[in-house]
Amino acid sequence: LHSDHFQNFQNMMEGKTYGRRMMMKFVMDTSWFHPITTKEIESVKIHNGTTFIPEEKMKDASGNFLTNAHLYRLYIYHWLMGHEHISQQPRLIVRWLEQKEAGMPLEIYAFIIDSSLAPYEWQRSQIVEHIIESMGWFGLRLYQCPSAYDVTNSNVYLSNKPVTYRKEDM
């Protein structure tokens, strides 16, 4: 008797499924969320060759630009929809998860058509690299806990002088 469980990949390897599932989370630094600027829209055009949605649809009902996070999620969804190695069946999901103290996770749930290990990992890496690269076009950053390097190289200087919060009389 075998007491360990195992995963049967035979159907996937024989092409009887939609591909191999890819589910990833990218934790975004919410301090970088803001209404998208025209500079960021131009950056997307330069790097992508076009905007993925017309500029008039980048505004809400009152005429204000949508946030860069909202448009980034739409961009990633449309980019994956057009990706030749992503299956359009059974589902493609790009969504925000509940915000945590470390940031707001963007979850990607998709199926990569190439189910063999090496091609799957190659395509998955290409997708991750594009997702990370394109964040900068929208003025976004991944969240990262401060490291010792960040603390020692910050521009905040500590002083042993007492701080006075009183306003000086003029």
Positions of predicted regions on the chain:
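Soluble accessory domains appended to multi-pass membrane transport proteins
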Residues: L1-K59, H70-R73
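Long, non-transmembrane cytosolic or organellar matrix-exposed soluble domains/tails
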Residues: I46, F52-M170
